[in-house]
Design a protein with these regions (language model features):
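Alpha/beta-hydrolase active-site loop signature
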Residues: 50, 74-78, 139, 273-278
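Conserved hydrolase catalytic core segment
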Residues: 106-143
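Hydrophobic, aromatic-rich cap/lid helix
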Residues: 191-228
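Conserved alpha/beta-hydrolase "acid-adjacent" motif
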Residues: 249-255
Length: 302
């Protein structure tokens, strides 16, 4: 492992937390790289779409005084740069998490968005997980946007990165309200301008949008695959903490309501004034401090 102090050189914020890096080999031979912070009982933080280990820098730092925090880069990004294969399923991500749990001995997991889906599925199948906290898994209880997947695949295959990003944000209902009134061609132009600035000035330790965009289709493939999985989660024996923000899209609250009814060992917290990005760094729209406080209490309970 190499010790490292990270500095985000973007003008919006400076994010510094000391960490070391390591890697594990997953069942299919894929190398999964991760960051490690702090000392204490192990926790793994699983990222969602359009994010990498850097997005959890502040959250990991706020937990590192009590826990050893492991933050893997999921397949196809950052320290785990081997691209997804065409035979992808959520089981691949579960196997990646299993390999990290086996190496580190960690028994607690936090997952955000699609990372929350991975964490739920892992809690169902991996006895090593004793506690899992999940932030707004996109189960789309009232209907999965299946039409978005072939469109995403086509746009990415054609190199239309900006169009793919807009398709993904609209399908996930993650864009600002103004997205619903701005014409598509203008949204694409604005996104291209942002990407051009990023290409010119760099993105610090954050992965650029251009690098993350190809992974979107696999996150949506996971969402489609997990449709109808709700009832299976009744068999989860691990303790589960459901987390969400009061300003998140309404469908995510519906999904949490449904999960709360089926999970046998469940608690729930809603953060007033926070949204889906709450666990990310502050320069990415997050407010990780209250999330860290909730996780610390949950994972420290006997």
């Amino acid at each position: 492992m190499k010790p490292k102090t990270s500095v985000n050189n973007q003008s919006t914020a400076t994010v510094r937390e000391p960490y070391t890096t390591g890697s594990v080999t997953s069942q299919d031979g894929t190398t999964i790289g991760y960051r490690q912070y702090g000392h204490g009982p192990g926790i793994v933080l699983v990222q969602g779409a359009m994010g990498s280990a850097q997005n959890f820098m502040q959250l990991a730092g706020r937990l590192s005084d009590t826990f050893t925090v492991y933050v893997p880069d999921r397949r196809g990004r950052g320290l785990s740069d081997l691209p997804y294969s065409k035979d992808y399923s959520i089981q691949k991500d579960v196997e990646d998490l299993d390999a990290l749990l086996a190496k580190t001995g960690a028994r607690s997991v936090f997952g955000l968005s699609s990372g929350a889906l991975i964490s739920l599925q892992a809690a169902l199948t991996l006895p090593a997980i004793h506690k899992v906290a999940i932030f707004e898994p996109p189960l789309f209880i009232n209907g999965v946007p299946t039409a978005v997947l072939p469109r995403l695949e086509k746009e990415i295959a054609q190199g239309k990165v900006a169009a793919a990003l807009i398709t993904g944000m609209k399908a996930a209902q993650m864009g600002p309200p103004i997205f619903n009134v701005i014409p598509g061609f203008l949204l694409e132009l604005l996104t291209k301008m942002v990407m051009a600035q990023e290409d010119k000035k760099g993105s610090g330790e954050y992965l650029p949008m251009r690098a993350l965009a190809p992974t979107l289709q696999y996150d949506f493939q996971m969402v489609v695959e997990m449709s109808g999985a709700l009832e299976s989660f009744r068999a989860i024996n691990a303790e589960v903490l459901l987390l969400g923000g009061s300003k998140s899209p309404a469908f995510l609250k519906v999904d949490l309501d449904a999960l709360e009814k089926v999970l046998p060992h469940v608690k729930r917290i809603e953060f007033p004034g926070l949204n889906h990005a709450a666990s990310w760094n502050t320069d990415r729209g997050g407010r990780p401090q209250p999330v860290a406080q909730a996780l610390r209490r949950f994972f420290a309970e006997l």
